[in-house]
Structure formats: C-alpha cells, structure tokens
Amino acid sequence: EGIATDPQKVQAVSEWPVPECVRDVRAFVGLASYYRKFVKGFAEIAAPLHNLTKKSARFTWQEEHQRAFERLKEALVTAPVLVTPDNEHEYVLDTDASEHSMGAVLSMVVDGQERVVAYASKVFTKCQRNYCVTRRELLAVVTFFRHFKQYLLGSHFVVRTDHSALQWFKRSKEPIGQAGRWIETMEEFDFEIQFRA
C-alpha cells in the first residue's frame, strides 16, 4: 500500500526518444518532473538537461545529456512505492548538500522501519554554490523544512545530516542576517538533530 507512479506515464517516459531539440528536452523534463518526488537526487540528475534549455545555451546533445536522460528514465521506471504520510508515525528527514545541489529524503517510521514518503532536491544557484559547507548544509535543512512543512509542522521529528557543525545553530545567542532568518524558520519546528557518521 502506498503511492505509486502511473504505469502509463512511466511507460511514456521509458519509450521517450532521444530529444532532438530544446522543445523535446523541455517536454521530457516536464513529464519526468511530475514524478520528481519518487526520484532521489532528481535535480542533480536532471541538471545537464536543464542546462540545455537555458536561453544562453546552444542545443548540442552530448554524452552527459545522454547519461542524464537514461538515468532519469531508469529512475522513473524503477521508482519505489512511497508510503502514504500520516501524523500517527514519527518522521525522519535526511538532508545533504553537495557542491552543486541539495537533497532530502522524508521517511516515516512504520513498524520499526523507515519507509520513504518523498524525495526532494534542488540545484544551488550560482551564489549559493559559493557558500561554505556549513551554510550549504543549513540551507538544505531550511529548504526542506519549508518543502515538507505540511507534514512536519506540529510533529516531533528527527533531522539527520552528515555535517556536525550544524549543532552550533541551537546555541547561537543572537544570530543575524540570513543565518538568523534561517534559524528563526527552524525554530517553528519541533525536531532533534542526529548526525550520520
């Protein structure tokens, strides 16, 4: 039981021919984006295809685009069945940030096992890529708190991250600027942080 992809849409994705122009790429990414919550790291996988659709880009289909195209198709064909969210079980939010993107997995603990509710990801802007690792990790946490707010607000949940420097935020006396606003957002939620080793 849970939420699954529509077999007809997945078949349409799996049979999609290699794009021959920007319009084809946009159409494919648009259809694939409909199921982005089923694909871990969707934004990072799709980034080469998105780059082809920018106004400043020339359409030249290369190996990196073919790999991204095939990886997205494979990810959608093998997409997991997601658990239906409820407020009866504890949520776990795993976040991570790399140099180019951030991602999250929202899970629910059901019968002692974590079951995926949804995946989410986002490519960093040019400015955000210049942030230090701690700031990128904090941005990921805040972004996905907002993204999954309808599930997390009002519930106690666990946030797992691999960046232990984030523990400073709870002890920060008077944060200012951007970090202060992010921390203010986080204070709306009831959570504990766990660190992956």
What are these regions (language model features)?
Residues 6, 13, 30, 49, ...:
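Mobile genetic element proteins and their domesticated derivatives, centered on retroelements
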Residues 57, 110-139, 164-171:
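A short, polar/acidic, helix/strand-boundary loop motif
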Residues 97-101, 167:
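Short acidic, Gly/Ser-rich segments with clustered Asp/Glu that frequently serve as metal-coordination loops
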Residues 1-89, 165:
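C-terminal reverse transcriptase regions that engage the nucleic-acid substrate
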Residues 12, 28-31, 51-52, 75, ...:
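Alpha-helical recognition domains of nuclear gene-regulatory proteins
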Residues 142-197:
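RNase H catalytic domain
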Residues 89-97:
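Two-metal-ion RNase H-like nuclease active-site motif
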Residues 46, 90, 101-105:
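Short glycine-rich loop/turn motifs
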